[in-house]
Amino acid sequence: MDLLPYDVVEHILERLDVKSLLNCKSVSKQWRSTIRCRAFQERQLMHRRQSCNPDVLLVSVADEFYLLKRVHQVMRTLVLGSSVSVRILTPWEDTLYKVCQSSCDGLICLYNTYASNIVVNPTTRWHREFPLSTFQRLDRYEHQVGSVSWAKLGFGKDKINGTYKPVWLYNSAELGGLNDDDEDYDDEDKNNISMICQGNNNTSTFCEVFDFTTKAWRFVVPASPYRILPYQDPVYVDGSLHWLTEGETTNVLSFDLHAETFQVVSKAPFLHHHDYSSRELIMCNLDDRLCVSEKMWPNQVIWSLDSDHKTWKEIYSIDLNITSSLFGSNGFALRPLGVFDKDKLLFCEPEYGDQLLTHDPKTKSYEFDYRFFSPTTALPLCYFQSLISIL
């Protein structure tokens, strides 16, 4: 290596996996400095993405009331095509979290009503905690009286500034039952409750964004003028987070993480009304494309958005007669996870994620890629291994 120009050495290092690069840091100060450089880390991640094969992470998750106390393995990476998983040790082994379904640059975001939120790189084990939002603090009181919220945290990246942002978007009625006269609230909570109660009269939603620089949450004004569907996971694609809207027709709502503005994406072929839209429509990121999966028996069709021409194209059609014979009958749409080997679709059983299936559109075949042989409360998600952290 000493005989090679250093730019050639960097070119070689960029193509190594993260585990090898972590070992290479001990070779020399120059190598260590290179591997710690953000520009190098971004190039390494780009090469990883070009492999077209993300890794699969299994995260033990909390139920809605955080009742499950026993946790065996908080995080595991899966070996597809087998029943093998590799445990990832974490400092929070005794605490259950919920997880954002969209990873970003190899980072995963975990959140909890009763403990600090966490951004973690499961490959390097780096993690950073950040505080509860206003919504989470107030939602904690809702849990105490038996009410359960359905809003879910989004996580993505401002592509212009390169900053990462956790985002809450929730309908104004979500915390409508709060009373700022309650003695359990502190002054800050009472002020926020008063603001939310006043806002309920003239706004559809509230939006909160966390700034890792100031280490604080702030409200985005104006928030979305459209209410969003319950129980859906925000999806990150290309600098924006996305939700499905509520109403007689279902639209795709986009939040630009740089401009921090909302807009409705072009008209979609699934605009007709769904009686149980949160069950029949699932939004996802497949190969860095915004996709919507629509269940209409006997098929589940997956549409992909062409961001340049603002048009939708059907890219997959899943035969529900076949999958129901494998998974059993279920009222929910199957959950797409990622694309492997350029065009094979990986998806999972919708409620528990305990069985992973691959669909090959060329041969129209289906086969199990991972099966659990005991009950699980963990959810799978796809990510690309990286060296990225949040400074």
Curated annotation (Swiss-Prot):
Pfam families: F-box, FBA_1. Coiled coil: none annotated. Residues 1-43 form the F-box domain. It comes from the Eukaryota. NCBIfam families: F_box_assoc_1. This is F-box protein At2g34280. It comes from Arabidopsis thaliana (Mouse-ear cress).
